[in-house]
Amino acid sequence: MKISDGNWLIQPGLNLIHPLQVFEVEQQDNEMVVYAAPRDVRERTWQLDTPLFTLRFFSPQEGIVGVRIEHFQGALNNGPHYPLNILQDVKVTIENTERYAEFKSGNLSARVSKGEFWSLDFLRNGERITGSQVKNNGYVQDTNNQRNYMFERLDLGVGETVYGLGERFTALVRNGQTVETWNRDGGTSTEQAYKNIPFYMTNRGYGVLVNHPQCVSFEVGSEKVSKVQFSVESEYLEYFVIDGPTPKAVLDRYTRFTGRPALPPAWSFGLWLTTSFTTNYDEATVNSFIDGMAERNLPLHVFHFDCFWMKAFQWCDFEWDPLTFPDPEGMIRRLKAKGLKICVWINPYIGQKSPVFKELQEKGYLLKRPDGSLWQWDKWQPGLAIYDFTNPDACKWYADKLKGLVAMGVDCFKTDFGERIPTDVQWFDGSDPQKMHNHYAYIYNELVWNVLKDTVGEEEAVLFASSASVGAQKFPVHWGGDCYANYESMAESLRGGLSIGLSGFGFWSHDIGGFENTAPAHVYKRWCAFGLLSSHSRLHGSKSYRVPWAYDDESCDVVRFFTQLKCRMMPYLYREAARANARGTPMMRAMMMEFPDDPACDYLDRQYMLGDNVMVAPVFTEAGDVQFYLPEGRWTHLWHNDELDGSRWHKQQHGFLSLPVYVRDNTLLALGNNDQRPDYVWHEGTAFHLFNLQDGHEAVCEVPATDGSVIFTLKAARTGNTITVTGAGEAKNWTLCLRNVVKVNGLQDGSQAESEQGLVVKPQGNALTITL
């Protein structure tokens, strides 16, 4: 919401009350409580007829400082509430002096001044990183609509850039944007978002989570150009400042607090193909797609059935359409015999035409209006109603239907929708409708996730989810929603993926080739390269199929090349996936996250790091022209082998079987020996590639098992012209390629052979000594 009108005025109809003077400071257990008045209250006569703000400072985890600013404490505070991991007895330090009161957790502290002018400062090791000054937080009375709000404005320094706030398709840097965290089904070409997360971070190395599930209004360097303002309709405002000091460290703390991304199964990193949305399909159509992929030597790993696996107008009652799929169990059995995993589409709604609608209504499993009638409308499905997942019996009914599908052979679910949740309703458990609007996405996906966890096991559970709220990163994978089939939407999708990664989500995908309309072949091929260098890769469309031969023969070559490349990269990719699970660092990440000390990376949103070591710059033009930036160092193309200097921009032109994919120096990269499947034994026949190891540096490569644990570690250390290579753990028949090295002066404990990319060394055991 807009509060100010320029620099000196406020918006018409608003009355503002600010904390201006500290009246008293108390320590209550592990909390620091500050009572602050909106005027000078040193005289007793001034202590009457005045509000008094209560500010509570606390720490749910080390390095996180919570702030709760309260006006009236008697207001209703119905749930839902974010599922936060709050630890007891976090070590804190409270200091109360004549000049200030300070609360400290880890290296982060909040300091409230006691002088004539109010200030709230957040400091890292005594150095201010942000805060709010006089009249920059408080209480807003809106006489236009008789509503009350709380707000805070945190300072932005010169050159400070803001990121996150969920999966947003606008410019990656949020500065200058107004953001309302209200989930909407708006596609990728608008300011609306499927996944609103009231959490942002900045390039100063801290993050802020606003702990309110309802709509939070952000003015990010917009209303006040040097401040992030956030406001919420409430009698209190609670937020957490999360210390870094690096972007990765911020996400480590944030996901430890809100939940780590689960580790998806290895097979989910392969290629997914769908029926598309409103296309005509039956078992014969499905078989023609799958057989066509096999005939063209196109690896395929997951097949997805979209909405029309069920009868029209009856979604979602979980019954296969008997006219289109008369033998679903037999069909699934036949598909799985071809080595495929099976995914089906679901949503949390039910059409009135469904035979089970009356049962659901009578049992009270559907969302109601305050007068007791069902909430219904005719959008999406005629007479559509919404499952009330605050009713445990409704959850059990829904879960039992899903378990029946799993028993039939379904491996995973595309959990679509969950954004357009109304507020003129009465939830079974009395939840606040304003808070449940966004949080519904969490309980919906949690329910489906738990079904898979209980049936196939957590190590095999995976979703393809559309909507999300805080904590939903625990239920991967998420995808970017409905995009157009053009380069602009391809770029929008990438911005959304980088944005959600900066909001705590480890795994992300998008509709390769675009969802709406049908892409020209050149767009499809460029998008395939981008999509198969994403954490998860799915071919999906709306009114047309996405099989590559529907475009041209070269599209088959592109899909084959990049699918095989991704399969070979799985030892590297799955280790990065395990790190996302352990630390919250997204697999696909903005350049500023990997290179926070390089200011040239702050605004980059057309390229990304795929893990710690590989830079990818998708091509957004038919001719193949692309510009990209490489940070400091010496970079090598993953398969072309050309080398480029960093700290500069580069301009190239690429064919459809290529794009800029550069590996940073001092990298030891593991490639597997299987280009047909993602799920294989990665520590057998592994080809390690050593890129530009500099004197005095060590490169380390950890090869994972399918549970994410490290099964083999290879290290290469260089001193002068000598490289010492040592392995630990279990590995068979591994080799080492010295990229762009054509010969060496000495080799101990191994043999050598030439290759186009560099000298290939085969060890006799698990150790080598190489003299350059």
Q: What are the residue ranges of the model-derived segments?
A:
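Short, well-ordered beta-strand segments enriched in hydrophobic/aromatic residues
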Residues: 34-36, 57, 69, 102-107, ...
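Beta-sheet entry/capping signal
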Residues: 64-65, 109, 119, 198-199, ...
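Catalytic and substrate-binding clefts that recognize carbohydrates or anionic sugar/phosphate headgroups
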Residues: 2-4, 15, 47, 70-72, ...
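Catalytic core of carbohydrate-active enzymes
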Residues: 449-462, 468-479, 492-496, 500-510, ...
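A low-complexity, Ser/Thr/Gly/Pro-enriched, surface-exposed linker/loop concept
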Residues: 2-43, 49-99, 140
